[in-house]
């Protein structure tokens, strides 16, 4: 019994061991993956749970599910340790073909199932990939179609071209080709020039579901092409900038090297052991000086270097550049007629080594004198009266001779103005006249003409009379117009702004007495350079006499408030017109302004006196403007000279003959406007200076415009509607077409009886107040009512001889 139990237990143990062994064999993980190239091959893959030798342990059986089909066997291969692949050869497939598959191992069947080739198509990889570069500016890739032309998928494929850099595969470009032709063309400039690229291609079926084929064998090439201009421009600019920088650095270091070799060897005063001696400081005005800080900031190193080489040229030019901004601020605008220049001496420095002679070069430079307007000139004139007093004028005479002459001349006219207003100047001028020595044997005749009425001009004879006077000398007067000869000087530009009130009859009487006193005194009569007489010896110079007069009467008298000379003259003309309105042909019309003065000129230009019996020609009598010597050249006759800066008086040979009669001078006057228009006189009219620098033809022009030659006038609003006013194109002066000009006055001069000879000369007259006047009467004339007209000082003071 025991034996039977033991046998049963042994059988059960064997069964259990067999079951365990059978259950521990190969196991398939999931369904296999099968695809077909749709030509002649189908492929299946299996994933196993353990490492298996596919060719020895597994076997695949397949057959087409069709009648009378046979079984086919495929031996799998290991694609990996746990993957088995089996490629099955099939007939040319069609869309309806289906295959039955069974996977067997040594122990039994592992898997079974069906597969349809049209459900999963994987085309084969393309081949024969080539690159063509003969296309202009493009690359051409070509490959072969994996399907034959009779295949259904020959025209149903999609191609993908991958182009990547050989050195960096991550940088690539993909082109999809959907057309049937197996080629791709793309521009060469889409790729970077100078880089090696690699290309490959794969295909996909469009007619059946499937997957991408494997990549075709790749090809490589070197991409190179010429860059366009826009792409080459940044590179060219960069290279150019680098080249320019290198060139500049090369030049800079070369110049520095040359400077050390050549420039630094030039001797300079800064490194010289010689001693510098300053001979004379720069004499410039306050506005031309600058602080050392400004000079140091504005000076440049290269200018300093050039100044060392060319001191006389570049140093002046640098100085002008420094002074031009400040001069433009301080100096007002100046017309071309007012341009004045004065010399200024530049400082000189001499290097004085031992036993070495160094020559001194004197450099002169011209600076433009500042011109002030009328208001500033009036303020400076008032300040000049105080600064030129005897206690303040001591230091002024230590300056240059030109400054002394300008100050003395200005103080002289200030003294004349004070004498006109306060009566002190008459005695001073008498004293100064007495100081002038007169040479024996010479007779000096001076005529001072002033308007004493609205229709006549009175002439007074001062000085010594000829030894044999003619009784017919003063028989009558004839009015003669003399053209103006005007000279410009900045020192006398504002004297007409000062005018004195109209003198009363008592003052006129005192003035006539003073004139008589002046007739008795001896006058200085310089010798005419054309005469053959001996020259006159002067005890004292003209400047010393003038300086003594300034010191004696500089502070005497008080000047009244300045008024307009033109306004006083218009009032005087109106007053004369109201008094003489009843006399026809004598008094001016009732008009105002320039028309009244024009009527005064026309009335005074007519001869009112008749010559007595026995005269030679014309009105007869003494003619002061006629030269008895016919061959002597005429001299210029400047008017409005204030008794200054005239030519040498003629010799006794040039005096007037006794049978001539003095003629009244009809002066051509212009009215002073708001702006002073001055121009230098013509060269033939400027008197020749004599003595020192003071005789420079200082003549003031306040009435006549030198640009157009007409009398200055300014019409009021009521006159604009009555008289046709014409504006001169040169200066803008308004003048009447009927008003006289310089040319008209010259014609009037010829038409008056007793024509003035061209050899008439003007001599130096005594310094008398400009409003001193007298009434000249002839024996054959009836008294004509006259009235002294108040005229601004400096506008009507005329002396002739």
Swiss-Prot record:
Post-translational modification: On IL4 binding, phosphorylated on C-terminal tyrosine residues.
UniProt keyword Protease, yes or no: no
InterPro entries: FN3_dom, FN3_sf, Hempt_rcpt_S_F1_CS, Ig-like_fold, IL-4_rcpt-alpha_N
Pfam name, any one: IL4Ra_N
Tissue: Isoform 2 is expressed in kidney, spleen, lung and liver.
GO MF annotation list: cytokine receptor activity; interleukin-4 receptor activity; protein-containing complex binding
Extracellular side: 26-232
Extent of the signal sequence: 1-25
Cystines in this chain: 34-44, 74-86
Keyword field: Cell membrane, Disulfide bond, Glycoprotein, Membrane, Phosphoprotein, Receptor, Secreted, Signal, Transmembrane, Transmembrane helix
Subunit structure, as described in the record: The functional IL4 receptor is formed by initial binding of IL4 to IL4R. Subsequent recruitment to the complex of the common gamma chain, in immune cells, creates a type I receptor and, in non-immune cells, of IL13RA1 forms a type II receptor. IL4R can also interact with the IL13/IL13RA1 complex to form a similar type II receptor. Interacts with PIK3C3. Interacts with the SH2-containing phosphatases, PTPN6/SHIP1, PTPN11/SHIP2 and INPP5D/SHIP. Interacts with JAK1 through a Box 1-containing region; inhibited by SOCS5. Interacts with SOCS5; inhibits IL4 signaling. Interacts with JAK3.
Protein name (Swiss-Prot/TrEMBL): Interleukin-4 receptor subunit alpha
Species whose genome carries this gene: Rattus norvegicus
Name of encoding gene: Il4r
